[in-house]
Amino acid sequence: NTVSSFQVDCFLWHVLKRFADQELGDAPFLDRLRRDQKSLRGRGSTLGLDIETATRAGKQIVERILEEESDEALKMNIASVPASRYLTDMTLEEMSRDWFMLMPKQKVAGSLCIRMDQAIMDKNIILKANFSVIFDRLETLILLRAFTEEGAIVGEISPLPSLPGHTDEDVKNAIGILIGGLEWNDNTVRVSETLQRFAWRSSNEDGRPPLPPKQKWKMARTIEPEV
C-alpha cells in the first residue's frame, strides 16, 4: 500500500545515501539521489509520516523479503526487469545553477511544475533535459531547462516532490506549455536532439513540436503568476 511503499523507498534511499557517502556514485546517481530526497520529503509531509521512523519500518520490510528470497529467484527477477538508461543534455553545473526571473510565471500541469521568465523577448532558446528512457521512450523526467544562446536559464520544468509519477505524455504537454509561453514573446524555441529522439518522435525541421498558433496562444495564456 501507499505507506509501505513510502517506508521501503525511505530505506532504499538511506542505502543509496550510504553508498554516495563513500564517494562511489557518479553524477547521474548523485543527481537522482537529491531529487529522490525532495520527493520523499514531500510524500512524508502529505502522508503525515516521519522519515526516520519510516526508514526503520522499511528496513524491516526489506529484510523480511530478503530472508524469503533465494539467490536463484533474485537472479531471475533482475534478469526480467528491463533496464532504463539515463540521458543528459545538461552538465551538473547547468542542473544545479540558481536562476532568477524578472517576470516570474508558474503553472502546475499534473505532477510537473512549469516556470518561466516572461521578461525574455526576441531570443533564440534551446530546451535541454536530463531524463531516463526505457523501450526508447522517455520514462522519468529529472529536470528540463530553457537556455538562451548566452547560457542564461529562462525556463524550467521539474517534477513536484509531493506528486511523484508522470508519463511521457505529461512531459510532452508540459513542454508544449513552456514553448507556447516563451514564443508568446517572440522567442524562437528549439528542442535538443536527445529530447526530439525520445520525447517527441514527430517534430518540425527546426527541432520543436508543431504547435498551431491558437494552441500556442492558449498555452501561453494559461500560465498563471507565481505565488
Curated annotation (Swiss-Prot):
Q: What role is this protein assigned?
A: Inhibits post-transcriptional processing of cellular pre-mRNA, by binding and inhibiting two cellular proteins that are required for the 3'-end processing of cellular pre-mRNAs: the 30 kDa cleavage and polyadenylation specificity factor/CPSF4 and the poly(A)-binding protein 2/PABPN1. In turn, unprocessed 3' end pre-mRNAs accumulate in the host nucleus and are no longer exported to the cytoplasm. Cellular protein synthesis is thereby shut off very early after virus infection.
Please give the residue ranges the record annotates as the region PABPN1-binding.
220-227
Biological-process GO terms, alphabetical: symbiont-mediated suppression of host cytoplasmic pattern recognition receptor signaling pathway via inhibition of RIG-I activity; symbiont-mediated suppression of host gene expression; symbiont-mediated suppression of host mRNA processing; symbiont-mediated suppression of host PKR/eIFalpha signaling; symbiont-mediated suppression of host type I interferon-mediated signaling pathway
User: What HAMAP family does this protein's entry cite?
Assistant: INFV_NS1
Q: Single GO molecular-function term?
A: RNA binding
Q: Which domain of life is it from?
A: Viruses
Its PTM note reads: Upon interferon induction, ISGylated via host HERC5; this results in the impairment of NS1 interaction with RNA targets due to its inability to form homodimers and to interact with host EIF2AK2/PKR.
Q: Which UniProt keywords apply?
A: Eukaryotic host gene expression shutoff by virus, Host cytoplasm, Host gene expression shutoff by virus, Host mRNA suppression by virus, Host nucleus, Host-virus interaction, Inhibition of host innate immune response by virus, Inhibition of host interferon signaling pathway by virus, Inhibition of host PKR by virus, Inhibition of host pre-mRNA processing by virus, Inhibition of host RIG-I by virus, Inhibition of host RLR pathway by virus, Interferon antiviral system evasion, RNA-binding, Ubl conjugation, Viral immunoevasion
Q: Per the record, which residues fall in region CPSF4-binding?
A: 177-212
Protein name according to UniProt: Non-structural protein 1
Q: Where are the transmembrane segments?
A: none
What's in the domain note?
The dsRNA-binding region is required for suppression of RNA silencing.
> What family is this?
Belongs to the influenza A viruses NS1 family.
Q: Which source organism does the UniProt entry give?
A: Influenza A virus (strain A/Mynah/Haneda-Thai/1976 H3N1)
Disulfide bridges in this chain: none
Subcellular localization, as worded in the UniProt entry: Host nucleus; Host cytoplasm
Is Ubl conjugation given among the entry's keywords?
A: yes
**How would you summarize the oligomeric state and partners of this protein?**
Homodimer. Interacts with host TRIM25 (via coiled coil); this interaction specifically inhibits TRIM25 multimerization and TRIM25-mediated RIGI CARD ubiquitination. Interacts with human EIF2AK2/PKR, CPSF4, IVNS1ABP and PABPN1.
- One Gene Ontology term, aspect cellular component: host cell nucleus
Record keywords: Ubl conjugation included?
yes
- The secretion signal range is none
Q: Where is this motif: Nuclear export signal?
A: 134-143
